[in-house]
């Protein structure tokens, strides 16, 4: 893959109820050159207060790095804080940002929300 970094953003919804509501994601996948900045965005179903970012590296199990209850985050990722950040506005859109991407950032990134 050379100097390209492939980050997939996918949606995984938690919960058994079907509300007929929609989910919005900014990109189905994102390809970035090594060293570039990347932002993944997730717009959860209205009324979902809890939001979870997951990461799955090639050949690894699912990791649970970041959790939001409302706009307050609990970061258990161990990801370098100087290069990674997650934000969520007033119970709404969440953005996961990567600065100066590296080969080790290659993974599937998923976001889920629940009420």
Swiss-Prot record:
Signal peptide, first to last residue: 1-21
Membrane-traversing stretches: none
SUPFAM superfamilies tied to this protein: Immunoglobulin (SSF48726)
Subcellular location, record wording: Cell membrane
Stretches assigned to the Ig-like domain: 22-115
Function as written in the Swiss-Prot or TrEMBL entry: Probable non-functional open reading frame (ORF) of V region of the variable domain of T cell receptor (TR) beta chain. Non-functional ORF generally cannot participate in the synthesis of a productive T cell receptor (TR) chain due to altered V-(D)-J or switch recombination and/or splicing site (at mRNA level) and/or conserved amino acid change (protein level). Alpha-beta T cell receptors are antigen specific receptors which are essential to the immune response and are present on the cell surface of T lymphocytes.
Oligomeric and partner information: Most probably, the alpha-beta TR is not assembled due to incorrect folding of the beta chain. Alpha-beta TR is a heterodimer composed of an alpha and beta chain; disulfide-linked. The alpha-beta TR is associated with the transmembrane signaling CD3 coreceptor proteins to form the TR-CD3 (TcR or TCR). The assembly of alpha-beta TR heterodimers with CD3 occurs in the endoplasmic reticulum where a single alpha-beta TR heterodimer associates with one CD3D-CD3E heterodimer, one CD3G-CD3E heterodimer and one CD247 homodimer forming a stable octameric structure.
Protein name: Probable non-functional T cell receptor beta variable 7-1
Naturally occurring in which organism (per UniProt): Homo sapiens (Human)
């Amino acid at each position: 893959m050379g100097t390209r970094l492939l980050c997939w953003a996918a949606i995984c919804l938690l919960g058994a109820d079907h509300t007929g509501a929609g989910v919005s994601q900014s990109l189905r996948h994102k390809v970035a050159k090594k060293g570039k900045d990347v932002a993944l965005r997730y717009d959860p179903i209205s009324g979902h207060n809890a939001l979870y970012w997951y990461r799955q590296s090639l050949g690894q199990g699912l990791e649970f790095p970041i959790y939001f209850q409302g706009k307050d985050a609990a970061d258990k990722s161990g990801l370098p804080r100087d290069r990674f950040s997650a934000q969520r506005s007033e119970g709404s859109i969440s953005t996961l940002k990567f600065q100066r991407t590296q080969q080790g950032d290659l993974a599937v990134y998923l976001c889920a929300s629940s009420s």
